[in-house]
């Protein structure tokens, strides 16, 4: 049955298709529009299609349409399994629906089943030949056959201004036919730039808009193309104005339309018709001084074609399209041969192209033509004079030798005529390396001499914007005039980005970057900054949506660069390689070149790893080459990390980081970042220690702003990681010491606050943890990490209703994020909904897997200030105990494998979810266990010797979502002690055989028929039943010793084990059989009297406290017991013990612990004998032992094991004991026989002698398990122990079978 919350989240997902229709349409064209129409009023076009497909639309047809729309929504979200389920449901209702057939073909195409898609295409042609549905499926199949490198080449030609060649390249992709829907807009935009083709481009865009009026991207392109021609410019303005109204449904297009509208206004002449449009713009934008100046031109004056051409030229120059820029400037020069700006522009084009002589001539002509603006060109001309020197400086900067470059520039600035140019370059360099103070002084020095220098004005404005001094920065920018409007907007955007970089509030950061996106929607660097901010906020799905245009359809080299950085940063090497293939090596930035080198290193190493069994030599070989940036070491380590081989990942980083004594800053940051990826914050911190605060005082060289930002983020991550590690070990005090610097450095940062909450959780102060989590969540309700933490804290604190409400809000808010469903799983588990918990976990697993594929593509109370303010002192130092560690199955580590990266291995969240699913599935599944065990105990045959065989059969029924269980056990048990030796020493020491011997001796005829049989053998057989209930803190059982034994007993017990923070208190009371011998366990019958005796039970009361100190577990406890039996002397016992064990080695595959145990117990009576009235169990009056146990556990593949060995020393003392302690008459008779020594009877005394023993003690206990299948596990165990006056060994083979795997 579908849960209500799942249905509501699905509806919310469908509703989202309307809210983000503009973004989805860019990627999927008309098909996404069909999915969105589920929530929008039907247009006339939709109604006509509906009439064609279903003339009388019944209720069933409406359901089919809804299911198909759901499928399209899921396909847009890359949720193909959900899409398949929706399509299957629709097919059961209307298998021949043409709408369904088109959607099925789309689904088959998306999952790569092209043959099936082609078959569906043929069926669709037969059902509805020539229909829109057939056309859409044909277009989709054609698009997916297009060569991505060829498409990237066409886009590159268009971006560089070679429109003619770009159009030819596009037409080659389309085989000369009509462009496919997803590429039609960009094709017609490119075609509009070809001479004489503007009309054709307009017609094509008009057809697109008519076919799909909600395609905002096509609407925008049409409006822009119309403004390029004077005859259609007013119509274009009207369309641009209309598009600005779609801020909610198409924010990117609306923002671009506003920018284009303003640009078009500057192209219009000032006439009575245009003046109201300009005035209306000024009313809304009173600070637009450039438009105000334009309006001051004489009314009715003709448009300045030269100015338009110059604007186009500088715009193309700024975009790097040199051919287009040269053509535009030449066009302006043809209109006016003395146009200084056009001449200067041509000079800049020549400089960019490396034609220095030509550039020098153009720049001199520009100064001569317009002396008033000579200052615009003198810096460039001055730079030409010393071009080689400046070239060498640029090469130094490109290679990272910024200090030497600064010295060169300072020298240049002292040369005649070079002060301004060299100082400008120096200031720019200082600004880029974070020396903002020095850069500001140099910019101001230039402006003091030349107040109109545009480069200095813009450089100083960038510095001031970065420091938050917006007022002065805006005042400087206002002095630039209209020709620098694009640069001004870029600087304004950079100011917003700088403000976003300064804040640690993730919500504010996202808000600022979204604001910047409205100003520069095409800026790829702004887009990747927003995506990164969203990821830091926890909204990876939205981050992927923001980056999707760049990842799927990059157009410019900058688009490719940003997309490559994002793909690589998210571990998607496949996507990064594909994007690299579409980018010319000439357009590689240093960062992109580093990524390309990493990809090449990984590819080469991966191909060779498949041919070796031991990768160590290959690791050393791969790292033998120089690694100045750290890229090589990171690439090798990252390859192994992605494969889950952390051993060789650590090895690679260790080799790389120790090859040179003096590592560069770049190397340290690179290696430390990779160390953090493989969860080694200690090594990362050690690498970063020499960098100090990043000012250069520790290393001698200042770090760039980006490097300082990376250093700050790494240090915060290290503090949080080390705190979490110590918290897991139970040492919250030391954890807080590591976390405190991060809390103090940035009190607004979210991750240290959540880490502090985890410390309080670890200490058991769930209420305080909840207060912190809720305070973070109130500040940013979108923070899924905070929400997940709050759900867990509420559940820990017993506030199940609050946990459920928080979890449901998270699912409703972010239904496509795995963390929302992990929170839901915690809430459902807290209220005992096991099936729902399992469904939540599986949903989280699917979503996380898909995310990796995409990126690899009660009222809430409490005072927020108190909750989030870091305490002034360490609140965890007051207590000297920590969080108890479990000695259960160790965490796994995958060893080296030549296989490719497995998501479950390489992603920590996915691995954790998989483990939870596996554990919960087992906890919730009824199970049956069956085994065969043997036990052998030393001693005299017929008395202390014991051989036991048992066949335990266990049935388990889970309760309360697997947190509790009811267990039923039946154990057939067989005991034997062997034949009593027929000697004069042994016979009288069992039962009442002493008197039988005496009677036999007195029987004068001594005939066999009058003799009493003393040749006894102890045998018992029976079945032991037991019923047990257990949960996390209490267990209780009731049962019996084997029914069928001579003297069965009712047994059982109860244990309470509440946990208060990291301390566990155990209190138990139980009644158990003493299984030392056949006598104590099952009871026996005396041959002479026929009386039964034995069957001893101990009634034991015990208390114990367990805690941890870091990796060390300590415990202490004691108890009291009363032993009773049938015709056996009652006894009492006191006992106590202390111990500790510590972790000495652990990786993800093995664990070793070493400990020490001190044991004491003592009984009132010594009853370790077998005459009538004795109990037959080891019961010294004092026993001391000190042992050292060593435990080794681990797993590999389908095997797991757990072995413990111990050795130590024991001292014990036993008092003497009467032969017949419960019968004075028997004892008196025995006293009378004391001293007899014959072949038939040897009795020195009627009391057993006492003893004092000191000896070694030790043993082992081991288990090996093998998982045959998901439902069946086999275990083989064995043990041996030497203690007291006995040795005991045993073995068992058992099977565990899940009856019903949930």
From Swiss-Prot:
How the protein sits in the membrane? Answer: Peripheral membrane protein
In the UniProt record, does the keyword Transit peptide occur?
no
Which biological pathway? Glycan metabolism; bacterial cellulose biosynthesis
Q: Which GO terms describe its biological process?
A: cellulose biosynthetic process; UDP-alpha-D-glucose metabolic process
Give the signal sequence positions.
1-32
Ranges of the TPR repeats in the UniProt entry: 64-97, 147-180, 306-339, 340-373, 572-605, 716-749, 750-783
What keywords were assigned to this record? c-di-GMP, Cell outer membrane, Cellulose biosynthesis, Membrane, Repeat, Signal, TPR repeat
Does the entry annotate any disulfide bonds, and if so which pairs? none
Q: Where in the cell is it found?
A: Cell outer membrane
Q: So which domain of life are we looking at? A: Bacteria
Q: Which Pfam family would be a valid example here?
A: BCSC_C
Q: Which PROSITE patterns match?
A: TPR, TPR_REGION
What the protein does comes down to: Required for maximal bacterial cellulose synthesis. It may be involved in the formation of a membrane complex for extrusion of the cellulose product.
Q: Which family does it belong to?
A: Belongs to the AcsC/BcsC family.
Recorded protein name is: Cellulose synthase operon protein C
User: Encoded by which gene?
Assistant: acsC
